[in-house]
Each structure stands twice: as structure tokens, then as C-alpha cells.
Amino acid sequence: MASPVASHSCTSALLFGNANFYSRIHHIVHRHFDLRRNLNVTILNRLAIVLPFIFFTVTTTAQDSLTIDYLLDRMETQQLKRNDFFIDGIFPSYISGKRKFKTRKEDNTIFYNALIVYTLKDDCHKFSIEQKIICDSIISRSMRALSKFKNRNRPTYNFWRTDTSFRFPYNSLLFGPKKTLPDDLDDTVLGLMMLNNDDSTKAAHALMQAYVNSNPPLKTTYKVYSHDSAYSTWFGKKMPVVFDVSVLCNVLSFVEKNNLQWTTADSASLQLIVKTIQRDDISKHPLFVSPYYGNTSIILYHLARLMAIKPVPALEQLKPGLVALARERVQSSNNMLEKIILTITLLKWNENPPVLNLTTNDVRDIETNDLPFFIGNIPSYFKQPWKEDFMGLRLLMYYHYCPAWNDCLLMEYLVLKQQKSKKFETNETFKR
């Protein structure tokens, strides 16, 4: 049996007798900590480079993200902006004689308020509580301003104020400073849809029946449309009858939204719209068949808005061709505002248009886009062939702009895109 002393000596020899043992252990430990220290330094150096980039990217994305909240706030800010020229509650709008936003002059009109309220009322049920508060505030201010544009004797409305005299916004040397235009069906139906007043709605619809093409053949349009008994754009007795398919879409939207009984004039107006589509005049001659909007894409937008209320069989039959036309134009257009209008149109038809990658950086350019949504078209009253000649040369035409309305269109696109995404997610969940 080995003695304890001998055992201890063996252990000592193993531990202390080997001169390289501690040296090797020390080297391994030292190298391990060196590697960890170097690794930590490398990681920290890389994080120092990467973290600011990540932070910048996240911050930039957050800043640039285009949201419904951002656009509603921008619209309300424009409505609340105080100015000696603009009526309280009116969205600032402008006129240009050169189809250039930068050459604009200020204009007071209820038209864009009515368009914005129409859109907000359509979309408000999709808004959050906070968004609805802003939406309701915009609508309330617009309704207070609306009274300044109402006819004193009947439930009709004017593009410009009726409560006081004002300088005619177009060429005063040509038309005179006190010249004004009669009330029109477009502002009337859009204004009445702001109010939701059943009595005024029915009274206005009854009044409209007297303002149709009752003395054919009409000299302000092509012969093929000259015997149609559709609505004129104007209420004025001294004004010639002027057809505009976009205005007629708004009138029929008014009829459909209020569940009014269709009249002979309503049916004749629908038939005129159908004919302009079948003859492809909405594509070949948009300024002639829609003189106050004058753009194929904007005509398509009006058609889609009407058809989104409830199916109109005569238009549903033509829908495939309309969709194809909208798709063709959204691909060929280089104008971002026009692309937005066409994308909204396709979404209203439950189609899948190309996604528009937009940020807050694009908003200013969209607000000041040179595409006019509405045109003050003096030659529209002229008889043929003078009408077509003057419009072909773009003489006596005035282009109307409203940055807040462009924001509203952008907001409408976001709402519809969001709704489309939710439907897709719901369908995918159901499939699973």
C-alpha cells in the first residue's frame, strides 16, 4: 500500500513539477479573454456604424409614412387658415388661365367643400374615433359656409357666393366686373348632399325637371346627342342647355343616394352617359362631352363613384370596357394626381390596380399639381362649330385648383387601399 506521503509527492510532481503546465494554462486563458475583448470591440464598432443607420431609417420611415391622420390634419389646417380673402370654412382654391398652378389667383367657391364633404361622408364609417372628430369638424364648418352660396328663393346653389356682390373671377374686361353665372345642377346636388334635408332634396329634384333639353335639336352638342332630353348643367332660363356627362353622374348620384323616384329626365341623362361611352367620346372627345371636367380619367372617376352607390344595370354592362380604359390610362399617365384618380376609380370597381408608393414628401407636389379637376369653360355655351373651335384652341378657359381636394383624393386612395387589404386578409383567413 502506497504511503500518503508518496501519493502527495506524486500529485505535487504532476502539478508543480511540470514547468510548462501553468504557462500553457495562462496562455489559453489570456488568449480566450483577448479573443472576447477583440470580439466585443468589433461588435461595438459595428454597432456604432449600424445603429445610427437603423435609427435614421426608422425615423425617416416614421416621418415619411403617409397616413389618413396626416392628410385629414393637413386638410383641416387649410380650412382653418385665416385670410382676408377667403370666407371662413372655405377651402382655399385658385384659378389659372394658363393651366399652371403657379400662375393662380385666389377664388372663393363652395364647390371643393362640397366634393370634400361628399368623400368624407362616404368614408367616415371607416375612420377611427379621432379621425371622425376631425371629419365632423370639417363638415360642420363647410355646412356653415354653404349658406353664403344658396339662392334666396329656391333650394339651389351657385358655384360662387350669392349673399353679396363680388368681382367676377374670370376676365373682367371681357365679361364685366359684375357678371355672374346662374345656379347650376352640379353645385346644387353636391350642396344638398351635404345637408341631408329631405324636403329640399325633393323640391330641388322637382325643379330640375324644367331644366332639360326641351327644344331639340340642341346646337351646343354633336348631332347624335342633340335630341336627348337630358339635364342641362344650368338653371338659368337665359343660359343655353349644356350637357356634361360628369355633371350628369353627380345628378344621378344625388338621385341614387337619396332613393328618389327616377324621372324621364333621369333616364334620358343615363342614356346620354351610356351613348358617350359606347361611342368612345369619353376617350376621344372628353372636353366636348364633359366641358367642365374635360379629362377622361376624371369622367371615369365620376362613373365609378355613381356605380359604387348601387349597381346601374346599363353601366354594369359597359364596366369591362371602362375598367380596361382605366387600366390603360393609369399605365400610360405620367401625372401622379391622374394616377391617384384612376387608382381610386379601379378600387371603386373592386379591381386590383398597381400600388402607388407615396410618402409625405410627395404631398406638396400633389397639392400643387397642374391637372385641374374642374374647368371654367366659357365656349361650352357656344353653338357648333364655334364651340369645338374655341375649345380646341383652349380659348376662354379657366382652370380651377384646390390643394385640399387633392389631399382628399389622396386620402380616399389610402382608405380604399386599406379596405381592400382588410378584405384580402379576411378572405385568406377564411380559406385557412
Residue locations for each model-derived region?
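Sec-dependent signal peptide cleavage junction
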Residues: 60-66, 426-432
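An alpha-helical repeat/solenoid feature that recognizes helix-turn-helix modules
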Residues: 64-66, 93-137, 151-201, 226-268, ...
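Hydrophobic topogenic segments
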Residues: 1-4, 8-42
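An edge-strand/N-cap motif at the start of beta-rich repeat modules
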Residues: 63-91
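Sec-dependent signal peptide recognition
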Residues: 43-50
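Long, hydrophobic, well-ordered secondary-structure blocks that form the structural core
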Residues: 205-221
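Hydrophobic h-region of N-terminal signal peptides that target proteins for export
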Residues: 52-60
